[in-house]
Amino acid sequence: MEQHELFDVTVIGGGPAGLYSTFYSGLREMKTKVIEYQPELGGKIHVYPEKMIWDVGGLTPITGAKLMEQLVEQALTFSPTVVLNEKVESITRNEEGIFVLNGSSGELHYSKSVIVAIGSGILNPQKLEIEGAERFEVTNLHYTVKSFKQFKDKTIIISGGGNSAVDWANELEPIAKKVYLTYRKEELGGHGQEAQATKLLESSVECFFQSSITKLIANGERDEIATVELTNHETGEVSCLVVDDVVISHGYEQDATLLENSELSIERVDNYYIAGNATSESSIEGLYAAGDILTYEGKINLIAGAFQDAANAVNKAKQFIQPDAAKVAMVSSHNEMFKKRNKELVKQLVGK
């Protein structure tokens, strides 16, 4: 019989929920693997590396990039196996009750338990549906804002009206020469962003509602966008704006193929989210979920909430593979696993 390396738990997804699941499973002395589709860990935080995050308990305002750096460092504490550039395409279960994860590389991953932490899915931004638009992606057509500095003193148009579009417009307004925003609806969208929307509408950002980008006109000398054509869907009026950069914020496609292709009958909500409970259990014994992919009554869709989901998922996974295990891990301040590490940290502090 062919032997395969078997893990106690495999975490699918390397965002905040997946990273904390990875750390906490190491804390519970579980042999852990984390699989991430992107070439690096961090998840959706890569979309807003310079955005300030205020709502993580115990942390003063921190940039997305810094939080991501710290989450990754924490996740690697107990030396888990990390697999990057791998998409888990389906989950099955063999005759021995072991989960078999089918990777896009052709590799099969074997695990006693699984934690699904794929958030809103693989990050595939919805592209601008204009013929030839893709050729500008190497110059001045952007689907995320990774550095505000690159837009300093430039004229920018942002297409979109959701949370990210509004946030980017507000962040860029003080440093850019001019910011335009075009949105296909009558008013800004987003959830819980009323204050940010009001701030934008009262700023120098010039908004074009019920309008969309219908044409990108290139610079004759260089292969980059020089002018954007906007069309008002109500009046049919066409206007042209001279710009330096175009930012598209039309959301992300939800890739539900992992759950759709799996032979396991995982109960879902809205044909995507995993239906679970407050202790991160799914309808499949041994398979748990954490973060935005998990839904239950009273769910908190915050990074802080993802951490609680992760700890619950790991605790349940631990008891699933070892029924006599403690329900929860020993708190870090009294945990013997950190004794040696704490001594080293104290030495470093005293040395300073």
Predicted regions and their residues:
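A conserved FAD-binding loop/helix module that cradles the flavin
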Residues: 168, 293-336
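Beta1-alpha1 glycine-rich phosphate/pyrophosphate-binding loop at the start
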Residues: 7-80, 166-191
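FAD-binding core/adjacent interface of flavoenzyme oxidoreductases
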Residues: 1-12, 27-28, 40, 81-154, ...
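C-terminal auxiliary extensions adjacent to catalytic cores
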Residues: 347-352
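A Rossmann-like FAD-binding core segment of flavoenzymes
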Residues: 75-103, 108-111, 173-272, 325-332
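Short, well-ordered coil/turn residues at beta-beta hairpins
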Residues: 13, 117-119, 159, 249-250, ...
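Glycine/Thr-rich phosphate-binding loops of Rossmann-like dinucleotide-binding domains
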Residues: 43, 124-125, 131, 167, ...
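FAD-site-proximal beta/loop scaffold in flavoenzymes
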Residues: 129, 133-152, 245, 249-304, ...
